[in-house]
Amino acid sequence: MAGPLFTANRAIVSAQGARLQLTAAHLAQEGIEHVRAMRDNEYLAKYEAALTDNAIVASTAGWEAFVALVSPCSVSEVCTLDPFLPMGVAANDSASLKICSLPCTTRLYLESGIYRGTGTESTKTSFTRTIEVEPVSETEEHVVSTVSWSFHGVTHSVVISDYLMPWQ
């Protein structure tokens, strides 16, 4: 009798672990996509402000604005993400990327089915998410999104990275 119950228990634990890993992968990818959207918004803002068809000028200006914007999310200080706040970087909860000194242990909250950077104690999850933007060259940034969580006393993490370059 104990054998089937043990097997059923292990199957449930495995399913829970898989669900958490899938959620973490989606949260990590959301971090990458948010930084990419920030780059795109800077380009579009510079393009519209220039009132010109010169896409190269807008691309350069947009890239420089993007690099300056995300520079606080570097190796020594990463950022956390709350995608429901206005797009930007700040040291407080006024922008989507919040500067967080290492080790950054800011938890995500699940409110109404949405993962956020703020919430109540009853909605705190075991997930943490950090965004790091490392300059590779003048025209390339390496974006790393890391989501970590604890399950049955073991810490797990999903790391997704991408390289962003200026619009051409």
Q: What are the functions of these language-model segments?
A:
Residues M1-Q29, M38:
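Aliphatic-rich helix starts adjacent to a transmembrane/signal segment
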Residues H26-Q168:
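Low-complexity, Gly/Pro-rich coil/beta segments used as flexible assembly/activation regions
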